Amino acid sequence: MRALLSRDLRLAIRAGGGFGLGLAFFLIVVTLVPFGVGPQGEILARIASGILWLGALLACLLSLDRIFALDFEDGSLDLLATAPIPMEAVVTIKALAHWITTGLPLVLAAPLFAVLLHLPAPAYLWLEVSLLLGTPALSVLGTFGAALTVGLKRGGLLLPLLALPLYVPTLIFGAELVRRGAEGLAIEVPLAMLAGITAATVALVPFASAAAIRVNLR
């Protein structure tokens, strides 16, 4: 399983959909917002939590189509389906590789980008907590959309339409956690909801993704 994880990390970096692309897209989203809503610090601070979370969500979408596509094209996915490792474990490893190459860099860079949006100082801790809790759910949910579209000629166009509705609860509670942290309000409810969503996603979605892969490989 370690060998599979290291292989997926190398493939993700070599394919060009890893660290740099997601961060660049995140930065573009954050820098374009002031042009659209104006440079007023008060307005930017009010919407910063939503913009940062939306940027992270869209950045995660960029490389979802590569989670299974490369393995499907070279036949590795068929070999993995017949390997002694359960397909659910393969899905989990691929989600982890996607998070390490996409989600983790966003978590580390988010405080720097938050400065551009005048995010209040008390919210920085909760921004990091929310992204650490929520971005793994984005990667795991993305495996389900990628599994449904693997092998389709225009799967990359269909994938965002499938993944975005699944991302909405994570987006809502992640942004709400940051907003409440910025305003000094109680954060227990959005924190618990975000943690619950991620826990349920990690526990259940790999089984659905594995089932979708098995159907597409028949």
UniProtKB/Swiss-Prot annotation:
Q: Kindly list the biological process annotations in GO that this record carries.
A: cytochrome c biosynthetic process; cytochrome complex assembly
**Subcellular location, principal:** membrane
Its Gene Ontology cellular component terms are: plasma membrane
So what family is this one in?
A: Belongs to the CcmB/CycW/HelB family.
Q: Spell out the protein name for this chain.
A: Heme exporter protein B
The major lineage groups are: Bacteria, Pseudomonadati, Pseudomonadota, Alphaproteobacteria, Rhodobacterales
Pfam short name (any one): CcmB
Q: Which GO terms describe its molecular function?
A: heme transmembrane transporter activity
Q: Where in the cell is it found?
A: Cell inner membrane
Q: Which PANTHER family match?
A: CYTOCHROME C BIOGENESIS B-RELATED, HEME EXPORTER PROTEIN B
The UniProt keywords, alphabetically, are: Cell inner membrane, Cell membrane, Cytochrome c-type biogenesis, Membrane, Transmembrane, Transmembrane helix, Transport
What's its membrane topology? Multi-pass membrane protein
Instruction: Spell out the InterPro entries in the cross-references.
Output: Cyt_c_biogenesis_CcmB (IPR003544), Cyt_c_CcmB_bac (IPR026031)
